[in-house]
């Protein structure tokens, strides 16, 4: 086959793949987000879709939702409520039900992966506990979660639900500001943390590169770039371009107060060894071999 013909064939194949084997995207139901909730012992699933028939300018959405005994059944029924063929290739957000545990995350993550693999841009949150109306709230929930990602330099990909066998860690949406963080252990209780502790957990999990949070009892806000390195069980927290913004007529040593709170948050996060959320056991075993005693994790804070 000549080179021009080969290029033409590849172009045709790519076009068919992108448009769904001959069906244009404009004729398909484009899924942007999937939300799950549990209500009265049953699952509820909501598909947020691009409304391609909307007459107004800008991005418009529509929803399809259903209830089922399982998450898979609820999602299948929501899909069946739509007249067109679904396209998951642009799916970039999924919300797990509030209060979910590790088993829920694995089940729902597998279901989503089957729909949208490999889904490199798909972000995962845990939904808040508010009683949402899918038709009224789904679009604003989607926009809010994407805004949180941008503002806080936050990203938890679908693949991060499966990187460890003993647990996973997922940001949790909150309607006011910032985000909470869910630590879901396979063989232990799920732990939800908030504020500075949540953002430290996200940094330790490699899901954020920024702290932007109140501290010192709400007296000030810290905005800083953050990077994490480790030597055995000693974690180095590198803070760059740090800015402290007092929220009143206070004159404090903000750096010292932040360091104190970070140390307290780190101690609390590493006290429970139900799962190796921050890979400290993993790196220690790689250095010293299986069976070696794990030293108490230590945090070094470096302002740069």
Name each model feature, range by range:
Residues 14-15:
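Residue-level signal for mature regions of secreted extracellular proteins and peptides
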Residues 2, 8-9, 18-304:
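Membrane-proximal alpha-helical signals and transmembrane carboxylates
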